[in-house]
Amino acid sequence: MAPTTVIADNNCNEESSNSFEMEIEAESAILEQIQNKMAKNLESAAYVPPTEEEQKAIDAKSVFIGNVDFNSTIEEVEEHFKGCGHIVRTTIPKDKFTKKQKNFAYIEFDDSSSIENALVMNGSLFRSRPIVVTAKRTNIPGMGHGVRGSSRGTFGRGRGAARGAPGRQQTVVVKYVYVNGPNRGGRGGRGRRFNPY
């Protein structure tokens, strides 16, 4: 009986090896995407907003930039202000509903001395538009604009407050009701008593 000769197919082995390597690369790419997504979620979950004092310190080193072109990029804004000092962070807020950029920005510098240099840029042309540069103000929680001009007349007389004006504090008028009526015939006005409401 003649011996059987087995010839190995090298092409099949190479194709199997290549297919296995492609599967490993694909799985590695998927795992990397998952890890990146988890890292972003952890970063957002670990974010702790600054305290009031910390926010004041940040704002003391920041400027507000108005009349910024809607298509501006952070890189372009930083390029325009790079000569003012070392920039820590540049923010162009977006509308929370439309997700479109607003027409203003904020720049935080490493040192408060850079603010004076940045204020010199007020009125300069950025994307062919004159921009407004001012020192950033710290927003104080609870200090809304609706209470301005309505402190007078809050108790009793009602002067200084617009009736029915939206967003303004309304005047509360306290009326007094005489229990037994004014005692006009009493001596020295005695007997005149009143209770609120």
Swiss-Prot record:
Record region (Disordered): 142-166
Pfam families registered for this protein in UniProt: RRM_1
UniProt keyword Transit peptide present: no
SUPFAM superfamilies: RNA-binding domain, RBD (SSF54928)
GO cellular component, one term: nucleus
PROSITE patterns recorded: RRM
Cited PANTHER family: EUKARYOTIC TRANSLATION INITIATION FACTOR 4B/4H, RNA-BINDING PROTEIN EEED8.12-RELATED
Protein name: Putative RNA-binding protein EEED8.12
UniProt source species: Caenorhabditis elegans
